[in-house]
Amino acid sequence: MNLSPNQKADVLIESLPYIKKFYNEIVVIKYGGSAMVNDELKESIIKDIVLMKYVGMHPVVVHGGGPEITNMLKVFDKESKFVDGLRVTDQATMEITEMVLLGKVCQEIVTRINQNGVRSIGICGKDGSMIKTVPKDPELGLVGGITSIDTDLIKTIIEKGYIPVISPIGCGPAGESHNINADEVAGKLAAALGAKKLMLITDVAGVLRDQHDEASLISDIKTNEIEEYIETGVIKGGMIPKISCCFDAVANGVERAHIIDGRKSHSMLLEIFTDQGVGTMITHGGDQNGNSKNNKQWKSIFNEHLWENAYSLPGR
């Protein structure tokens, strides 16, 4: 699309209030899906992240890497096993996971950011005992659930002018590595950092009223509307853990959480810097009586529906 000079000026002017609003604010980005595989989409995401830094925001990137891990397991002739959609992670699988996430995926993201003129550094949750975890389920092996996050290391990296890129690997009670769901890392990290926004880059347009019609996109959801959307089947299957992640972040102080289609070029910029935005935005809302459900009530709601159509792989 070719824009006239006046149209280009209009686009820049439209973005100005948002640049002011998010200047010097932390934005946590969960980077996954097709945008990690397609070279054009990779470059689009990286340029979005770099531009965010140049206009004064502080992007923090948490990445996935499920397809790359699966491919590497095949190279080592090791079968991928799943329980309720979660990858069973024995010691050998954990070592391969670390090799892929830290040695390949994270380094590629860091290199691409550096090549675009902004300094970046790659770390994982074990560095500085940043993300502490415990085993989620003995049947899953070294799959971890987050118990605490120490943000000092990330804040230091941000203060030095770097973009932190974080691999979803946690530190267990005995110092062992745990494979963590990247959505969970992003959501809890956003809350711990006091981020202004959480952005989940996915392979869907957002929450759809009709799963087969992207025109049915729901652009704005309040937290008090989530239960009804789950009960009526609008939010289901693979969308439930993402909504759960967004809810957890918003309930703990993050102003807005977004589910964004990473298959579309520059989708993050469109969400942040335009009036219309893209994807689905989740913001805080009380229940019908003006009160918020407590976290235990919400966890019960999410867990009740979570594995009806299990999909999510830890660390993805």
UniProtKB/Swiss-Prot annotation:
Site, Transition state stabilizer: residue positions: 30, 242
GO terms for MF: acetylglutamate kinase activity; ATP binding
Residues that hold substrate according to the record: 65-66, 87, 179
Localization in the cell: Cytoplasm
Gene3D superfamilies for the chain: Acetylglutamate kinase-like
EC number: 2.7.2.8
UniProt superkingdom: Bacteria
Catalytic activity reported: N-acetyl-L-glutamate + ATP = N-acetyl-L-glutamyl 5-phosphate + ADP
Function noted in UniProt: Catalyzes the ATP-dependent phosphorylation of N-acetyl-L-glutamate.
Protein name per the record: Acetylglutamate kinase
